């Protein structure tokens, strides 16, 4: 007889409200268990602890955390997190026609807006060689990443990841449904 794995989520709490567009999910489980957040695999350290950033969309976000042991027994918890975040696209529409020095300065770098389509998607983003985001984007979540020379994107579900580079038309990161690593965007893109 095998027991279900232990799963303790230390944060966030169900029903939490956040002003931003991301939240850190943390807790612990059995060290040999397979952990997922919204069906995306998450690394568990050798003490069974986990910590993962999840990008949110505006409104209510359902986050399901599951832990499965080697006997295929599982435990899960579901949280509803409310985000009051305004997406970059909406902010751009509201400020259209207004030009400031900050906007002119930003145009000299690289701007990449990333959107997760219909499934939770793991994402890693580097700007100018520095890791600036690693976590899971929920469906519909949008995040803007800026770099001086380049922005490099790795996605766990490339065909569900859409990018808008330097204000140009949105496009799919790749047609491949799997992992695509180190797609580089530069000032000229």
Residue ranges with predicted function:
Residues 1-86:
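Ser/Thr-rich low-complexity repeats and stalk/linker segments
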Residues 15-17, 92-142:
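Extracytoplasmic/periplasm-facing segments of secreted or lipoprotein envelope proteins
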Residues 22-24, 49-51, 109-111, 140, ...:
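Transmembrane beta-barrel architecture of outer membranes
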Residues 26-34, 116-121, 157-160:
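Short proline/glycine-enriched turn/loop motifs at strand-loop junctions of beta-rich domains
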Residues 124-126, 130-134, 138-189:
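Extracytoplasmic
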């Amino acid at each position: 007889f095998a027991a279900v794995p232990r799963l303790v989520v230390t944060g966030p709490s169900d029903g939490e409200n956040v002003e931003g567009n991301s939240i850190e999910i943390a807790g612990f489980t059995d060290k040999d268990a397979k952990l997922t957040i919204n069906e995306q695999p998450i690394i568990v350290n050798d003490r069974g602890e986990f910590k993962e950033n999840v990008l949110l969309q505006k409104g209510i976000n359902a986050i399901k955390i599951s832990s499965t042991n080697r006997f295929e027994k599982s435990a899960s918890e579901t949280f509803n997190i409310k985000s009051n975040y305004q997406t970059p696209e909406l902010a751009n529409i509201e400020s259209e026609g207004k030009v400031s020095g900050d906007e002119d300065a930003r145009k000299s770098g690289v701007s990449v807006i990333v959107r997760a389509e219909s499934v939770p998607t793991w994402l890693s983003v580097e700007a100018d060689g520095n890791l600036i985001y690693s976590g899971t984007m929920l469906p519909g979540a949008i995040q803007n990443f800026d770099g001086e020379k380049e922005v490099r994107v790795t996605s766990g579900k490339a065909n569900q990841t859409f990018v808008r580079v330097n204000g140009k038309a949105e496009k799919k990161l790749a047609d491949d449904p799997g992992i695509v690593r180190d797609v580089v965007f530069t000032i000229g893109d």
